């Protein structure tokens, strides 16, 4: 998994899967990346993210260096989908979702990175989004800050970064399989709970 907000490191964690759904440990979130430029048929990528605190909702952006793909951070799949779909509908930008509602949204319909709004209105919307982002994330300067969102996928930096092609190692420039081992733990049964085996 990816550890850290600005300077990332490789991490290892054991997670449980129940009914096909990964149970996120406390302090972990998901990062999801979708290729949005139509250059290849990449499957959306997802990885565990540690070091962003307890995200209470989702943060989505298409302003994400260097590839500017659609990136979503969060713990709740519904909020993540809501934020992502808001950006898809508006042609890009940034969005915050929490408990099934969009808290704030800045549309950037020009290449997913620029707005055609007057500067004063764009500044007002962006200030609102930045201020409301503290309802979703616990910011801890200097590294875990709102601006760090746009660099979460900057694969030219050292350490692990999720891209539209997969989890990459910034040092080796290789795509890495994030799943190292998988084992099944049987559910407890009455027989397993009785030391006599009766």
Language model features: what each stretch is:
Residues 8-13, 49-52, 73-75:
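A short linear-motif detector with a strong N-terminal bias
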Residues 70-80:
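Extended catalytic/binding region for NAD+/ADP-ribose chemistry, centered on the ART fold
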Residues 29, 35, 44-67, 83-87, ...:
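Catalytic centers of hydrolytic enzymes
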């Amino acid at each position: 998994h990816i550890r850290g907000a600005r300077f990332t490191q490789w991490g290892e964690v054991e997670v449980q899967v129940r009914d096909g759904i990964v149970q996120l440990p406390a302090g972990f979130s998901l990062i999801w990346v979708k290729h949005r430029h139509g250059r290849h048929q990449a499957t959306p990528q997802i990885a565990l993210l540690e070091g962003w605190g307890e995200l209470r909702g989702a943060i989505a952006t298409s302003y994400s260096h260097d590839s500017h793909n659609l990136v979503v951070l969060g713990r709740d799949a519904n909020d993540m989908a809501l934020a992502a779909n808001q950006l898809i509908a508006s042609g890009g930008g940034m969005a915050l979702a929490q408990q099934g509602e969009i808290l704030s949204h800045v549309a950037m319909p020009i290449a997913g990175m620029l707005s055609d709004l007057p500067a004063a209105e764009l500044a007002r919307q962006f200030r609102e989004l930045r201020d409301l982002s503290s309802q979703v994330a616990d910011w801890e300067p200097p590294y875990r800050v709102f601006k760090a969102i746009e660099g979460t996928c900057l694969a030219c930096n050292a350490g692990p970064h999720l891209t539209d092609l997969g989890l990459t190692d910034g040092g080796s420039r290789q795509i890495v399989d994030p799943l190292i081992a998988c084992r099944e733990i049987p559910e407890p049964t009455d027989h397993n709970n009785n030391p006599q085996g009766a």
